[in-house]
A protein has these predicted regions:
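Extended beta-strand solenoid/passenger and fiber regions
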Residues: 87-160, 183-218
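Short, conserved charged micro-motifs
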Residues: 79-88
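Surface-exposed ligand/attachment interfaces on beta-rich extracellular proteins
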Residues: 11-14, 18-26, 53-58, 115-126
Length: 218
């Protein structure tokens, strides 16, 4: 069975010319009709805290940006000819070999950026990492769909979209040029468990438990 990616409706017209970055060969976790709207999502950081006898602390932050942990709930999963969602779900889990391989996930509530800053030209730098912003906080994005890149509000000159969300300009943007982009992005993820169970409730309907996974770095 093919694994069909969820593409935001506004992006459908751009599919024929879409460019993926850092996503070659990776399956996309599909959206299932029986998927519960209740989704758990949490940023996770890595911090070492050493407390002395006096109560003072020394804290060390090891990550420059968080990993995101997700948990999806499936209320009903169909398992019948023409609507075998259970087979599709097991397929992506087995293709990923549980925790081993990566896949892509789109969060319908957090998959689009508009005029996001990702750097300022200095006249010599050609390579820039695309980012997305949460208020004043910015973090890199690695799997990008059909980005529109601007230099100080005007269409950017020649560039290539490299793996892991990097933009490489043919000519370095001039000093002071503001670089922005708009488009869609996916989270690169892996499953948090090596087992995926489901419970049969009728002849052709199954109930799934939670599906847990975390974003990863390339």
């Amino acid at each position: 069975l093919p694994i069909t990616p969820f593409i935001p409706p506004a992006a459908v017209s751009a599919l024929p010319t879409g460019i993926w970055s850092g996503a070659a060969g990776l399956p996309v976790l599909p959206f299932m009709p029986g998927q519960s709207p209740a989704v758990t999502k949490a940023p996770k950081w890595s911090t070492e805290v050493v407390r002395t006898a006096s109560g003072r602390e020394r804290r060390t932050a090891y990550w420059p940006s968080p990993l995101w942990q997700f948990e999806l709930q499936y209320e009903v999963i169909r398992h019948r000819p023409g609507a075998d969602e259970l087979a599709i779900l097991w397929e992506i889990f087995n293709v990923s070999q549980g925790q081993y391989s990566a896949f892509l996930f789109v969060d319908p509530t957090d998959c689009q950026v508009a005029s996001a800053a990702f750097g300022t030209g200095d006249g010599s730098t050609k390579t820039f990492q695309l980012q997305r912003q949460l208020g004043s906080f910015a973090e890199p994005v690695y799997a990008v769909f059909d980005p529109t890149v601007l230099e100080s509000g005007s269409p950017a000159g020649a560039y290539t979209l490299e793996p892991n969300g990097q933009i490489v300009f043919a000519a370095a943007p001039a000093e002071g040029v503001a670089l922005t982009w708009s488009g869609y992005f996916y989270f690169g993820c892996r499953f948090l468990e090596d087992e995926l169970s489901a419970e049969q409730i009728t002849a052709q309907l199954w109930a799934g438990k939670s599906l847990k996974f975390t974003s990863i770095r390339p």
